[in-house]
């Protein structure tokens, strides 16, 4: 019961901030441009600062080097999920014009905007390195295979652009993480004033991320949140297949219990918030992607407490 209440408490913290964003959206305080500004503040300023501060202040070189080989666990999970998603799309006759988007949303999860704050709320800062391991793998898969699949749905032939993909993979958050790694490995100590700046800016990550999700829910409109076949299959993939698969992969592995829990929670996160943006860019079904981001984000509030109890 205590575990359930703890997980509910963590979710309520997140839900409260999402509600603030939703109310502001309903009041018309933010237009498309200002919503984009919040997303840019999070991904290009707050999150890189948060990564850099957290890595340099809380971890040693030995801690970080020991964790890098564990990338193989989320990588294996995503490869298998990709195969399952492809089979499901074929068996259940998902529309060809949204099949690539469907597969991408099935096997990729929102590991930062939602995953990081939820893991922090549930497990504290000790979960951050494990969150980042999953994030590194997830973002690489999304900006390569995921983007290619979405582009294939859109107008014209899909092309794999290595330069563009590398630019997306090495995003500001990942660069902040990698810079933090270098600083820790080289035993460089940040000046106190710089560490404080990073801490203040990094602390914006969680509230701004949750407000952005609330604004997105408001923008999509509650009436659009209907459950049809394609929506139900994504929900099944995100919240049943993915966590069960990850649990099966890590169950016998000699990993810390916290790492196993974080990996399972990360695998059960909602659809990536970048999916609608990429879909819009390539002429795919961006409305479908936006609805799935909203539905899966809302469903997370129910799923995570259940997962916490099952993992106890």
Model-derived features: positions:
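Alpha-helical transmembrane segments of multi-pass small-molecule/ion transporters
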Residues: 1-312
